[in-house]
Design a protein with these regions (language model features):
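Absolute protein N-terminus
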Residues: 1-3, 65
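Short basic helix-loop element that most often maps to the first helix and adjoining turn
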Residues: 5-24, 49
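Conserved hydrophobic/aromatic packing and binding residues within compact polymer-binding modules
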Residues: 7, 21-22, 32-35, 61
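Short, charged recognition helix plus adjacent turn
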Residues: 10-13, 52, 62-65
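Recognition helix of helix-turn-helix/homeodomain-like DNA-binding domains
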Residues: 26-41
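DNA major-groove recognition helix of helix-turn-helix/homeodomain DNA-binding modules
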Residues: 45-60
Length: 65
């Protein structure tokens, strides 16, 4: 499973739009969309920010837990 599908699942479970989440993470919506569609991979800092936002581990973010 690619990380993009996990990102989308987490976001939609929270009832957030891509724009809302991108603003909370201080990244552009375009970049966030690329992460969800697996067109681009988030850097480590972004991954940590996402995991912190959802209060999950990086393993959970990658679907390993």
């Amino acid at each position: 499973m690619e990380i993009g599908s996990n990102l989308k699942r987490l976001r939609t479970n929270e009832g957030l739009t891509q724009t809302q989440l991108a603003q909370k993470l201080n990244i552009s919506r375009v970049n966030y969309t690329r992460y969800e569609t697996n067109a681009s991979r988030p850097d480590y800092e972004t991954l940590v920010a996402v995991a912190d936002f959802y209060d999950i581990s990086l393993d959970e973010l990658f679907g390993r837990a």
